[in-house]
Amino acid sequence: MSIGAEIDSLVPAPPGLNGTAAGYPAKTQKELSNGDFDAHDGLSLAQLTPYDVLTAALPLPAPASSTGFWWRETGPVMSKLLAKANYPLYTHYKYLMLYHTHILPLLGPRPPLENSTHPSPSNAPWRSFLTDDFTPLEPSWNVNGNSEAQSTIRLGIEPIGFEAGAAADPFNQAAVTQFMHSYEATEVGATLTLFEHFRNDMFVGPETYAALRAKIPEGEHTTQSFLAFDLDAGRVTTKAYFFPILMSLKTGQSTTKVVSDSILHLALKSEVWGVQTIAAMSVMEAWIGSYGGAAKTEMISVDCVNEADSRIKIYVRMPHTSLRKVKEAYCLGGRLTDENTKEGLKLLDELWRTVFGIDDEDAELPQNSHRTAGTIFNFELRPGKWFPEPKVYLPVRHYCESDMQIASRLQTFFGRLGWHNMEKDYCKHLEDLFPHHPLSSSTGTHTFLSFSYKKQKGVYMTMYYNLRVYST
């Protein structure tokens, strides 16, 4: 049975004009002996969240011991995010069911609790690079618009196999491949062309496993791939992410060279990615080269859709955190001079100063040696475009005092954009989403804030969250 058919059995029709779902009375009331109705005795559907309904109505996917753990740990937050982003009830159920049915099994085995009642990073079955405590799920909330913000919920995951880290699958490559070739992938509209191209160029074979394990630097991750799902109003968009680090260790080439060669290989064989793609990549390579090795290509992503509609994004991490250096990077050292980039730089200046509370644009943020410290950029390549389009990820996890400080400062920036609902409610939303996180005393719930700008869409921002399954 498809997700659509299942959802119709639970929610017979989309919400009506009065805001209630057709077939769902606001209250089921008990008739009293005098003919009146007791409004307090019956079951109020308004008191049940979609998470509650699906928990009661749907069997857990196999293996239930693991998917049950992930549903309890993550399902409530996913449901709340869909509600706060104002998804219609029917769409809320549709996407929460998709998460329940198709995504939960990808999160892998539940952690062994041993003598503890709460998981910790030390007993994570696989050390996912997706979040700093190895939680393999990172939901995010995108807001964009020239006036009031429009919202989209997204989720990033690292699919984890039950043999991840073992001799048969030491780098956790099997689960993502199996999913992308499954019926479940067709349910989320994923196509394979670009996925297979980059998988073939980035994944490593069994003949190299032993040698690569010996080469991995201390403290380095071995994640090979992520998936992400944009829960748009009309459809799901699937994205695949690949890490070039193992292929870099295998070949002795830089991660930038590994990615560049793969894109060149694609452009030479594709009717879609041609000379413009090669030119855009060369602009990026020239900028990366100007840093003398300090800027490193971290990963690459593609939209798993028709090639003509897809994008290739190259993610680069640099150690610099001064506003001046960040703005220089955003425009690729002056190589991007279009109006979108110029206006984006003005807004980025205001956002950075607001979130980090800095005045001096030459001042670096406090020194931090964590593997995920520094500033990340992605540069987007599109078919037919001669230049990449920039996006920056503000590393708030490492450089702010607390998550509530981040939220409060974001509210200030939202107000300047005219996003008054987010200005008024974002702090309250955060507390409701993560009631058990120490939001006022630590960071770790927000991971990054991304920012880009286009005149047609306005400011385009995403707040990324760590559910902190393995940390308190």
Swiss-Prot record:
Single GO MF descriptor: tryptophan dimethylallyltransferase activity
Sites where the protein binds L-tryptophan: E138
Induction: The expression of the hexadehydro-astechrome cluster is induced by glucose. Expression is controlled by ambiant iron conditions in a hapX- and steA-dependent manner.
Pfam families to which the protein is assigned, alphabetical: Trp_DMAT
Transferase is among the record's keywords: yes
Keywords: Aminopeptidase, Hydrolase, Protease, Transferase, Virulence
Record's catalysed reaction(s): L-tryptophan + dimethylallyl diphosphate = 7-(3-methylbut-2-enyl)-L-tryptophan + diphosphate; an N-terminal L-tryptophanyl-L-alpha-aminoacyl-[peptide] + H2O = an N-terminal L-alpha-aminoacyl-[peptide] + L-tryptophan
Keyword RNA-binding: no
Pathway it works in: Secondary metabolite biosynthesis
Required for regioselectivity (site feature) positions: G156
GO biological process: alkaloid metabolic process; proteolysis
Binding site for dimethylallyl diphosphate: R154, K239, Y241, K313, Y315, Y393, Y460, Y464
Protein role: 7-dimethylallyltryptophan synthase; part of the gene cluster that mediates the biosynthesis of hexadehydro-astechrome (HAS), a tryptophan-derived iron(III)-complex that acts as a virulence factor in infected mice. The enzyme is specific for dimethylallyl diphosphate (DMAPP) as prenyl donor.
Binding partners and assembly: Homodimer.
Record-given protein name: 7-dimethylallyltryptophan synthase hasE
Source species: Aspergillus fumigatus (strain CBS 144.89 / FGSC A1163 / CEA10)
Taxonomic lineage from the root: Eukaryota, Fungi, Dikarya, Ascomycota, Pezizomycotina
Gene: hasE
